[in-house]
Amino acid sequence: MQLFHTILAGFLRRNPTFSGLCGVLLVAITLIGSPARGADEPAPAAGLAVAPSAADAPKDVAPAEAPRPPGGAAVEMPQSPPMTPVPIGYIREVLDHPRPSSRMDIEPDDAGIAGAKMALDENNAGGQFTGDLYSLDAKTVASPNAAVEALQKFYDSGHHFIIVDASTDTLLKLSDWAKGKDILLFNIRATDVSLRQENCRANVMHVVPDRYMLADALAQYLVIEKWTNWLLVHGTTPGDLAYVEAIRRAAGRFGANIVDQREYKDVSGGRRDDVGVIPPGKQASADEAFAAEPEYQVIIVADEDQLFGPYMPYRGGSEPRPVAGTTGLVATTWSPGHEKWGATQANNHFQKDYKRLMLPIDYQGYVAARTVGEAVTRNQGADFAMVAAFVHGDELQLAPFKGIKQQYRPWDRQLRQPLLIATDKVPVSMSPQRGFPHASHADIDMDTLGIDEPESKCKM
């Protein structure tokens, strides 16, 4: 009886989910194995196992010894095996962005980190059965050099898997320092295409989509809806201009037409008073001065810092047109309004735990941490070489609430993933769209988003 109690208690420590059932079993078995009670003795309270008192023990009987095998040695009681620690690092760089036009676009302090923590809950739910214990350690830094120092400290303390929420330059510095070491970085912020092309790195996995993927996903939807004539309005930051290049590429790939392109120049201090009006196009000749504005069906906005874009749906010109791009209808990894494939439960869980809505950067942190958890579980261990090989290979199958298994492309380490086409309230579609089959593999339509293997300049 004592041996059974010990085994059952050990199982209960490792599997608290079954605590209710185990408690009932312990009570029942204790009652069955106890001496019969007198009529005047009170029964034990429901749900409590009552140990027999000293008075209940037979007189002049020696205490029971642990069972012994035929050889005479005492049987060792089973013990729970030690848990294997799987620490995950998180480096968050404070980026110097201009204040957006709306305070609602300011990210909370735990953006990204909260998503990774939610993934750790899932990792540890499975880890209690596999013997793995996951933890997340986050460091906030203010410069690339400080980020490298944080990475070094993580590595010295046994962290091999690092989630990076930082700029392109910082990510490259981290990758260079980590070269030749047992470190795998997960990029959840930087969308620069160069990180997947000439500046690709074997030790960097890209969870966040690049600008080509975002532009392609949006373009496919607009073309399917037959909104093929676009007016392109953009800011002047390097990010805005890079998004312009991605939009022009997507238009050429999927059959859209950019009828005009106009630049918005932000005047410091003036955008609170008069902002969002489409700037005039290039200077027209005398013969063109009275020509009508070009016909366009959609205004595409390239304004990654949200300086003027949010005004465009309502102050975009004399003719009302839908707005898409970096504001209005956007391509994104996540929406708080997403409700399919378990997304409702994910959003509810996140909102309950963190008292706010789940943002795309949170989702990206979640996927990064779940990648580690899935790889460790499937490999039945946290050996770095085995886990890294699994993440790089084609056996990884992530299922993060989009109805299709996801993995990383072998040629540039970019996560293959569907992208939501969403407003600030609800998703309206998901790309890739039907009607854009892959050139060589009809069943791999996700590779119609972003850089396909024949286009890749990545050499790792």
Across the structure, where does each feature detected by a protein language model lie?
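Extracytosolic ligand-binding ectodomains
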Residues: 2-4, 26, 38-460
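N-terminal secretory signal peptides that target proteins for export/translocation
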Residues: 1-16
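Residues marking helix boundaries in flexible regions
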Residues: 8, 30-33
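Bacterial N-terminal signal peptides
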Residues: 20-31
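The N-terminal extracellular segments of secreted preproproteins, especially immediately downstream
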Residues: 10, 18-21, 457
